[in-house]
Structure formats: structure tokens, C-alpha cells
Amino acid sequence: LCHPFVTQMADGTLPPEKFRYYMLQDYLYLKDYVKIFAAIIQKADDFEQIRFLSGELADTIGETFRTHIPYMKRLGITEEEIHSARPHMDNNAYTHYMLWEAQTGDVLTGLVTLLNCSWSYAYVAEKIVERCPDALRDKRYGSWFAGYVSESYRRTNQMLIDRIDALSGFIDEKTAEHLCEIFEKCCLFDLRFWDMVYAMGGN
């Protein structure tokens, strides 16, 4: 909540170059994020799980095309820049860790790898908007905050949380500790992501 990237977005002072770099890196992150869903689907053992996971995967891809790519174009990011962009090593480390946990664990493990990113963005956006309502009206960054405080995004998050709660009802202590470790590591990776885009995105 106190990271300069999000606080400067909230008051409209974040240099546009930093946000452009963030959007490109986030786009690359999302490409791996959907692969993690695909890895989890392979572990699903009934049609209901497959239906839920496939729906989440389709929603993520759809949101990328409906919102993320048009947003990048409004920022002046060209198709050439999008296709030539390469993930920063911190971005790679994050998604590779998530994918490894999803591939080597079960459905619950895979869903926990996804939880931090989804949940933390909603939490950060909500708290920032509570503290600084004008953030929603900022010409450059307002729609970013609006997306993460929207009812549809909250509903999607709650579905993920409910699914994790249902699957974790009978796990043992060792498994619970491992899942907590995954969540904590993903929190740290997310913080490093903010640090990375703030440092690499120009002055």
C-alpha cells in the first residue's frame, strides 16, 4: 500500500514510462499465468473442476484482449513493442516458480500459486481508492484502479477463494504449511515485481 509505484499512480504522479514498462511486463506475466491454469486443468479429476478452471482460463484470456491490450494501445505501445518485449529476470523467476509448483503439486497447490496476484491486486486497489477516491478519476491510471475494484473482479476473486477453502478443508498440517509458504513466496515475488517495474521504467 505504500509502494511508490501504486501511491504515485493514485495521485497521478507516476511517470508514464514506468507504467508503460509495467503494462508490457504484466502482459508477459499474463501469458505465463494462463499456462499455469492449463497445468492445473491437467491435474483436475472431475468435470466440475475442469469446468471451473476452464472458465477461469477463458475469463483471463478474454480480459487480456478486452482490457489489457487496448489499454497498452492507448498508452502508445505498438504491436512491434508488444511482440518484441522480453520478460525481466524477476518476472521470469516469479512465473517459473508458480508454474513449477502447479506442475508438481495438485489442484489446490496450483490454485494457491494464483491466489496472491489475484487477491492482492484487489486488496491494494480497494485500499488505495478508499484512501484516495480521486484515483478513480485520474485520466491515465483511473481505469486501472476501476478494473480491480469492480464487482466482476471481486466476484471472480471470491470464487477462487471459495474453491481453495473447499479443497483445503481436510489437509494435514504439513500441506497447510507448504501452501502458506507458497503464498508468502508469491507475495515477495509480487513486491519484487513492483520494485522491478518502478526501477526499470525510466525516471
Can you name each region flagged by the protein language model?
Residues T13-K43, E63, V112-A122, W194:
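Alpha-helical bundle segments that constitute or directly flank the non-heme di-iron/ferroxidase center
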Residues K18, T109, T175-A176:
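Inter-helical linker of Solcar repeats in mitochondrial carrier family
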Residues E48-R155, E184, L188:
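Active-site-proximal alpha-helical scaffolds that flank and shape metal-associated catalytic sites
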